[in-house]
A protein has these predicted regions:
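Class I SAM-dependent methyltransferase Rossmann-like catalytic core
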Residues: 2-15
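Conserved catalytic/acceptor-binding region of the Class I
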Residues: 113, 120, 128-189, 209-213
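C-terminal helical/coil "lid" or tail adjacent to the Rossmann-like core of SAM-dependent
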Residues: 4-5, 173, 177-228
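A short acidic, Gly/Pro-enriched loop at the edge of an enzyme's catalytic core
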Residues: 90-100
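Class I SAM-dependent methyltransferase SAM/SAH-binding core
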Residues: 34-38, 42-90
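A short SAM/SAH-binding and catalytic strip from SAM-dependent methyltransferases
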Residues: 99-112, 135
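Conserved alpha-helix/loop element of class I SAM-dependent methyltransferases that forms part
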Residues: 15-33, 48
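Helix-to-beta-strand junctions that scaffold the AdoMet/dcAdoMet cofactor pocket
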Residues: 109-110, 123-125
Length: 228
């Protein structure tokens, strides 16, 4: 996964957290004792989980030490783990959870065909695997990033599949399977705010791909110019 900057990501905390709130609200389980938040970032999603299930024992997991540090500082009462999601899913641990939750993280993790069944094994019978992945890779702002980057730019791959892929993968092992798509429209004040939004998410892998600060500055300048 790309490395993340918690301060940059949280510049738009309310907007970034809304899909997480909606996902948590769709999980109909009431008696939830244990939850793990995969790809918890700076803990904004973990806070939503705590509000949804206030009596639960909550664990946040992320492979970014800086994100976990920020999450632990903001919410020291929960358990925090620095670990890669694939490694966690492949670990033969017997620890299971009432809810395995992941908001806007698994699109950075490869091999969903093997990953999702492994994650599902960590859910207790009668529990829930609740996951949200963005599906806006073909939005104009995202397409523009790829147009500006040279073909030689090595950018971390985005992993997302059509809805029927996930249905076929999970239906036989699920008592109930809900799949839906929501489009979130964020009204931002100006072009600069749009660029700041994407610097905390979609632009991050592109900016990491450049070797020099000069290249990053040039890329951002061209992106800002063309997104107007």
């Amino acid at each position: 996964m790309p490395t993340w900057n918690a301060d940059q990501y949280l510049k738009f905390e309310d907007e970034r957290t809304q899909p997480c709130r909606d996902l948590a609200a769709r999980v109909s389980l009431a008696d939830v004792r244990t939850v793990i938040d995969l790809g918890c970032g700076p803990g904004n999603s973990t806070g939503v989980i705590a509000e949804r299930w206030p009596g639960a024992e909550i664990t946040g997991l992320d492979d970014s030490a800086s994100m976990i540090e920020d999450a632990r500082r903001r919410q020291p009462q929960y358990r925090w783990i620095i670990q890669d999601i694939t490694r966690w899913a492949s670990n033969p641990s017997s620890e299971t959870f009432d809810v395995v939750f992941s908001n806007a993280a698994l699109q950075w993790v490869p091999n969903h065909a093997s990953l999702y069944p492994k994650v599902l094994e960590r859910v207790i019978p009668g529990g829930a695997f609740a996951v949200q992945i963005p599906c806006n890779l073909n939005s104009p702002a995202q397409v523009l990033m790829r147009q500006i980057a040279s073909p030689a730019t090595q950018v971390r791959e985005w992993h997302a599949h059509p809805r029927d892929f996930y249905y076929d993968l999970l239906a036989l092992d699920s008592a109930r399977l809900d799949i839906w798509e929501t489009e979130y429209l964020h009204v931002l004040p100006n072009v600069e705010a749009i660029v700041e939004w994407y610097k905390g998410s979609g632009l991050r892998p592109f900016l990491e791909a450049f070797d020099t600060e000069s290249d990053r500055t040039q890329f951002l300048a061209e992106y800002s110019k063309r997104i107007r």
